[in-house]
Amino acid sequence: MRIVFMGTPAYATRILEALMQAIEHDVVLLVTQEDKPVGRKQILTPPDTKAWAQEHAPSLEIYQPKHLRNDEAVSKIAACRADFIIVAAYGQILPASILALAPCINLHASLLPKYRGASPIQSTLLADEAYAGVTSMLMEEGLDTGVMLGFSYLHVKPNDTSEQLFEALSDAAASLTLKTLAHFEQLQPWKQVDAAMTHCRKIKKEDGLVSWQEKAQTLMCKYRAFTPWPGIYLASGLKLTELSLIDAIGKNSRIGCIERITNEGVVVACIQGSLLISKVQPSSKNAMHVLDYIRGKRLTCGDSMV
């Protein structure tokens, strides 16, 4: 089958790789976002799917339109005469003119109708869900509202970060893509139940701002959801780069203070529960072990961790 693949991050790359390796499929075009400046030096960097294709599939044509709502984009994709358009975290909503070209199947990284939108994996971790998953869905003009074709789910491990969960779900999505295509004609699509629907928005850098006035369990969920980006940080700019939950329910009077110091790090009191902080990163500096940080700041038990 002739496939146009539309995807941008590493999550999509694993699906693209599986399609390229399947002898029954012919990926004729990769559509991805434009190269973007990254990091402090603003180095122009290609999307993960493009970087992979350039190294492993140099003959695959790559198309990077700024927008899809124009005649050029529609003509480019239409010329491929695709049997299917596979979409995975592409980054733009597909207009009706493209949806009409071929069946468009989206591999959305949630168990729909939960977490429609831009940050399903982070939202799964923020809610401390026990399970995560991928839904294959026949696309329509609404945001992740199409009829569902199949699911794949897995248990979320207690210390999974969004990076680790992305990796696990990308493997699940790759397998689900191949199964959906293989059985497409026999599948019985079913509608989403709108009453069970939740939305999730795009993650912003400021979402990583945290306070010891929050529950330890909440901070732990934010740490898992926002690792590696944007990370979590205090109002002082101190980034908490490695931590673990010590106590989720204890009430504390000295909120934000160092309760004790161990070889592994420092235990800090939250409004409810406590966290073990092992590594931190001061603003404009490299990450370091927290013991080196408190030594330099001359902090000890009872002092505020700022």
Identify the residue ranges that each predicted region occupies.
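Donor/substrate-binding cores of folate-linked one-carbon enzymes
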Residues: 25, 84-200
